[in-house]
Amino acid sequence: MFGFVTAPFDLNLRHLRAVSAIAARGSMSAAAEAVSLSQPALTQGLAKLERSLGATLFERHADGMRATPQGVLAAQRAEAAFGHLARSVRGAAHGGARGFARPELLMTATQLRAFLAVADAGSFAAAAEATALSQPAIHRAVRDLEQLCAASLVERRGRGVILSPTGIRLARGVRLARVELVALIAETGAEAAGSGMLVIGAMPLCRALILPAAIAQFTRAMPRMKIDVVEGSWRELVDPLRDGILDVMVGALRETAPPECDQSPLFVDRLNVVARAGHPLAGTAIPSLDQLASYPWIVGQPGTPLRLQWEALFAERTLPHAPVECGSVMVIRGVLADTDFLTLLSPDQVALEVDRGLLSTIGGRLERSIRTIGITTRTSWRPTVAQAYFLDLLRDVSRAAGLQENR
């Protein structure tokens, strides 16, 4: 009877290594030797893995083992997962300590789950509670990983722990490996079609228009997919993206893609000066820079696209007084409604407030205030079919939004 695994670290890592070995060598005996298992043990392990996934990964032929389409996908994802682990522990041994040549090949799923729980929770007690493992089991798992890596992974701080530099690298590798295992389950499992998870980092502009429309269409087409939306600024989201906590970020792109990330533009957005309804400049068709500079401003944090656009607007004169730095559109709206402050925002971000007569745009869209809105992903990320479909929906919705803007 086929089952279905939902937790990535319920999978046996040695059996996953065997999947890659069988696919590469086409032989159970050669694969068994490669992963240091007897052939009967490998046969049993493969059967257990196939039952857990609810999928047939290999077919036996006269000339050896041949991977099914699901087996090919599983082998690719397993290779990617072990690749992330290998890179995270490369050169980890400290102080001349002699570690294992390939520690990632000796790690167990239980060890990785326990270590990641400590990394996320910040203490052994909280990690034990989160995983239903005992504290001694958590301690033992982390200690075993430290022996494999020949390096300290955690450091005590009061009642909790923090990760050492080696621990930080390993935690990222484990998270990225987990992403691959989640994708493996989604692509090969008994309910593979249209199932799985997508974690989206949502920056301010995309929350106003693009993302809600894309999610609405996506959930109608793929009701079994789970979507988790994490809101934040670019600075708050980029490290979780690189760590594998997020799958994709949607919002304003940077001039240069951050390390280990790729950027894909969706459309170009132009900004407006925004103020409260009834502001002294409301109704001014083309306000001068002197007029705009005579009022206080709310601006973005240094280095953010909104801040750079504001600085460019006043490049030919002294910057106006800007006592408030804020990246929260909700807070900005509230301050604007009760003051004579000005700010730069996309009209889409304040469309509802403008329609209700709470805020107003001053003048037209600023021709030089161009922001490219798009998708940021990890360079190593390979989306599942369902995740790739969501990206296509984002592009479709964005094209429609772009056409409306250019009318």
Placement of each model-derived feature along the sequence:
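Secondary-structure junction motif
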Residues: L281, Y295-R317, P383-D392, A401-R407
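Short beta-strand-centered segments that line the small-molecule binding cleft or hinge
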Residues: L106, R235-L271, S360
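A short LG(V/I)-centered, amphipathic sequence patch enriched
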Residues: E50-A67, E146-L163
